[in-house]
């Protein structure tokens, strides 16, 4: 459950390390984002010589949340930290690698490129 001002880790090699959510996309009154949703983020911490720099405003897809994700079979999955992958306006990842596991729910939201780059799909 991601809302405005939430800090997230970046799960790709775009050069950003930490980002902060500044808007949840998808309706004027929408407050929360979950796995697979697109948010607008501000880069708060970045490595030198990365593709992005501190202060940039970009879009990102939420790939891991500390809030549980309920599945239709009754099982629950949750992660230790909130994480996102930076994407461009065509919803393609900016980085070439994804770090850590991603949930199956990304497939239903049509983020196939992220799923194909991820080392593990839970």
Curated annotation (Swiss-Prot):
Keywords: Ribonucleoprotein, Ribosomal protein, RNA-binding, rRNA-binding. InterPro entries: Ribosomal_uL14, Ribosomal_uL14_bac-type, Ribosomal_uL14_CS, Ribosomal_uL14_sf. PROSITE patterns: RIBOSOMAL_L14. GO terms for molecular function: large ribosomal subunit rRNA binding; structural constituent of ribosome. The keyword Ribonucleoprotein applies. GO terms for biological process: translation. GO terms for cellular component: cytosolic large ribosomal subunit. The keyword RNA-binding applies. CDD domains: Ribosomal_uL14. It holds the Pfam family Ribosomal_L14. Belongs to the universal ribosomal protein uL14 family. PANTHER family: 50S/60S RIBOSOMAL PROTEIN L14/L23 (PTHR11761), LARGE RIBOSOMAL SUBUNIT PROTEIN UL14M (PTHR11761:SF3). Binds to 23S rRNA. Forms part of two intersubunit bridges in the 70S ribosome. Part of the 50S ribosomal subunit. Forms a cluster with proteins L3 and L19. In the 70S ribosome, L14 and L19 interact and together make contacts with the 16S rRNA in bridges B5 and B8. This is Large ribosomal subunit protein uL14. It comes from Mesorhizobium japonicum (strain LMG 29417 / CECT 9101 / MAFF 303099) (Mesorhizobium loti (strain MAFF 303099)). The gene is rplN.
């Amino acid at each position: 459950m991601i809302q405005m001002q939430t800090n997230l880790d970046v799960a790709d090699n775009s050069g950003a390390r930490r980002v902060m959510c500044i808007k949840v996309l998808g309706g004027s009154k929408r407050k929360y984002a979950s796995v697979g949703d697109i948010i607008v983020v501000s880069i708060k911490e970045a490595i030198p010589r990365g593709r992005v720099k501190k202060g940039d405003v970009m879009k990102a897809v939420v790939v891991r949340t500390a809030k549980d994700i309920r599945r239709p079979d009754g099982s629950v999955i949750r992660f230790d930290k909130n994480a996102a992958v930076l994407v461009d306006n065509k919803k393609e990842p900016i980085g070439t690698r994804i770090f850590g596991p991603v949930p199956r729910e990304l497939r239903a939201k049509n983020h196939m490129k992220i799923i194909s780059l991820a080392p593990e799909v839970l």
